[in-house]
């Protein structure tokens, strides 16, 4: 088995571009979500960390109030593919892009849609969330479903922070290329979560 450390791979590519004249680009992507065209997920797009977090909240049925205003992107996988094709044709002097939907949504929006669909997630204090998560981690039948939330297990939740990214340059490049990201509206969120539910995503322990 070969393991590739992402930063090391990027470093190697950038060195090849700089020293060997390789025509290459690094295009990082956001949270790959259901297609904009029909709301369907590709099989391998439901295994990323963000999706596992959603499963954890749905299983725990609790969400920390201080994270309700955290912003995330929903990047439809078919739209990401379009941007990659466009960005790959840009000047060779530009080598790093971040293809992520520029229209952010707050976690609170997602929690409310989940609840409208019957998931019954309670918004609670950080302390209550942490207590409930630790209790569920002791349940062998459910611990795997909430394992992605293990970073909250620190005794001090205030030590955790979200790393913000800036893809302003990429977004402006896409505008120059005649592309605009679709707005992530209520209907898209609802369709995406319903599609996940139909796939049995929230109950499966193998994803």
Residue map of PLM features:
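A hydrophobic C-terminal alpha-helical subdomain
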Residues: 63-67, 130-180
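Alpha-helical substrate-binding/gating segment
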Residues: 51-65, 71-107, 111-116
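Short beta-strand segments
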Residues: 26-28, 33, 97-101
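Glycine-rich "substrate-gating" loop/helix at the edge of Rossmann-like oxidoreductase active sites
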Residues: 35-46, 65-75
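Active-site Tyr-X1-5-Lys
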Residues: 1-30
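Short secondary-structure boundary/capping segments
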Residues: 40-49, 112-118
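Amphipathic terminal alpha-helices
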Residues: 160, 164-207
């Amino acid at each position: 088995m070969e393991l590739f450390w992402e930063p090391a791979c990027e470093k190697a590519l950038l060195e090849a571009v700089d020293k060997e004249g390789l025509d290459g680009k690094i295009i990082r992507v956001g949270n790959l979500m259901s297609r904009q065209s029909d709301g369907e997920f590709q099989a391998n797009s439901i295994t990323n960390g963000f999706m596992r977090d959603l499963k954890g909240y749905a299983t725990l049925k609790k969400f920390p109030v201080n994270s309700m205003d955290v912003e995330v992107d929903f990047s439809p996988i078919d739209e990401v593919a379009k941007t990659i094709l466009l960005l790959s044709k840009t000047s060779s002097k530009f080598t790093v892009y971040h293809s992520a939907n520029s229209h952010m949504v707050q976690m609170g929006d997602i929690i409310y849609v989940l609840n409208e669909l019957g998931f019954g997630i309670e918004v609670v204090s950080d302390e209550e969330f942490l207590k409930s998560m630790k209790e569920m981690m002791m349940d062998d039948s459910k611990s795997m479903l909430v394992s992605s939330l293990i970073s909250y297990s620190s005794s001090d939740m205030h030590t955790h922070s979200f790393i913000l990214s800036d893809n302003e340059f990429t977004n402006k490049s896409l505008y120059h290329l005649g592309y605009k990201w679709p707005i992530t509206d209520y209907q898209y969120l609802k369709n995406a979560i319903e599609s996940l539910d139909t796939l049995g995503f929230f109950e499966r322990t193998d994803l």
